[in-house]
């Protein structure tokens, strides 16, 4: 048996071309001083060059467009478009032509053909054209598989395939950080870096919160009733540049009232990023669900609801505390003790009975205190004792207050 049989020639030819938008023609201007040897030769040549901008010949960008010279890069979130053409190069009429285009990724195989219907016949020098589109959602190696089947005039069924391999790169590097506030607010800092080789126009960067939170963007400065982006009027992100976005998430009332709901790992939401590159090519990227570990408060949580920023020296002031039973099963019987520090003195009776506190419920408590030392003072010295388990919970450095003398505050 001859293993080196000649390769069979097919009657049809398959051509595949990636569809991308053209780019502006660039040239490298060469200039010199008038007193140099070339004189005005370079200047005259640039003015006569049809690709330069009239009146601005030294600009690298011209007025002409150039078609892509190679396959180029494909980035995650962009739309991959390709033109597929099957041409009859023979002098025979070909029948029952079927063209199928699949995209093989590392995890799945997708059919991209707009139509899989069989074409009854294809005359000589005629062609079948198709344009496919696919939003790229995976990085790594992709293989475009184009398969063509047809029948010759003699009734012989023919079939051939072609493979086109390309890599999908990551366009953005997204890093997130969470900051937990005492008021159950969560601040999300998103750092977005452009890791491509061309500038990006950041059309939209938004946070889609989960059902547990409401979100507010902190990337706009309000001046005289008008909002201005913290990044200025130009929203371009140059290659390797990083931009930081900040968001504030607040638990919805129905979840905030339930102390046991926002514990452990909670889903915050996901980032939705939309950008445009050269000549308006659009890309979109959505992160997976962002999760954060909620801070642990133990069985009993004490938080400050209201406290003045500035108080007078040796004059009483009030603060409002919120005490929450974070346990989902056990009722607590609490006793409040107030311990004085060198600067902070509590006003009232220590050892007060607060009564029973049911699971996942809260109570509000107003306390009076005064400071005997000026400056920024820390509020400390609260103790809660559960009489059922004989367990004491200590709360120090729960808030800070600025203490000024009475004369200084009166003058201001």
Swiss-Prot record:
Q: Which domain of life is it from?
A: Eukaryota
Regarding protein family, the annotation reads:
Belongs to the TRAPPC13 family.
Q: How does it assemble?
A: Part of the multisubunit TRAPP (transport protein particle) complex.
The record's annotation in PANTHER family points to:
TRAFFICKING PROTEIN PARTICLE COMPLEX SUBUNIT 13
Listed name of the protein: Trafficking protein particle complex subunit 13
Task: State the Pfam families in the record.
Answer: TRAPPC13_C, TRAPPC13_M, TRAPPC13_N
| Database matches in InterPro entries | TRAPPC13, TRAPPC13_C, TRAPPC13_M, TRAPPC13_N
């Amino acid at each position: 048996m001859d293993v080196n049989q000649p390769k069979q020639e097919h009657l049809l030819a398959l051509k595949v071309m990636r569809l991308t938008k053209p780019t502006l023609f660039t040239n490298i201007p060469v200039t010199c001083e008038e007193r140099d040897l070339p004189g005005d030769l370079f200047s005259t040549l640039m003015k006569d060059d049809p690709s330069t901008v009239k009146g601005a010949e030294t600009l690298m960008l011209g007025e002409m467009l150039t078609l892509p010279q190679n396959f180029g890069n494909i980035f995650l979130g962009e739309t991959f478009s390709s033109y597929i053409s099957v041409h009859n190069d023979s002098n025979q009429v070909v029948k029952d032509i079927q063209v199928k285009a699949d995209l093989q990724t590392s995890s799945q195989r997708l059919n991209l053909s707009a139509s899989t219907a069989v074409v009854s016949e294809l005359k000589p020098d005629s062609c079948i054209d198709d344009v496919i589109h696919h939003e790229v959602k995976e990085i790594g190696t992709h293989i475009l598989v184009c398969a063509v089947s047809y029948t010759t005039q003699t009734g012989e069924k023919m079939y051939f395939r072609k493979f086109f391999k390309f890599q999908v790169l990551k366009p953005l590097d997204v890093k997130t950080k969470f900051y937990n506030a005492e008021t159950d607010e969560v601040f999300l800092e998103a750092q977005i870096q452009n890791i491509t080789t061309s500038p990006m126009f950041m059309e939209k960067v938004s946070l889609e919160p989960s059902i547990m939170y409401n979100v507010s963007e902190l990337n706009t400065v309000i001046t005289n009733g008008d909002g201005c982006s913290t990044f200025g009027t130009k929203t371009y992100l140059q290659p390797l540049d990083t931009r930081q976005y900040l968001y504030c998430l607040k638990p919805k009332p129905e979840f905030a009232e339930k102390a046991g709901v926002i514990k452990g790992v909670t889903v915050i939401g996901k980032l939705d990023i939309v950008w445009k590159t050269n000549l308006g090519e659009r890309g979109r990227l959505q992160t997976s669900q962002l999760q954060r570990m909620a801070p642990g408060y133990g069985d009993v949580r004490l938080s400050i609801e209201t406290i003045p920023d500035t108080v007078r020296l040796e004059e009483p002031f009030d603060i409002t505390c919120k005490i929450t039973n974070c346990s989902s099963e056990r009722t607590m019987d609490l006793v409040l003790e107030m311990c004085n520090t060198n600067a902070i003195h509590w006003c009232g009776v220590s050892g007060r009975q607060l009564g029973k506190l049911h699971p996942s419920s809260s109570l509000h408590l107003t306390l009076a205190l005064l400071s005997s030392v000026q400056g920024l003072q820390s509020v400390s010295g609260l103790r809660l004792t559960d009489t059922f388990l004989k367990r004491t919970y200590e709360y120090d450095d729960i808030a800070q207050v600025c203490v000024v003398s009475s004369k200084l505050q009166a003058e201001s």
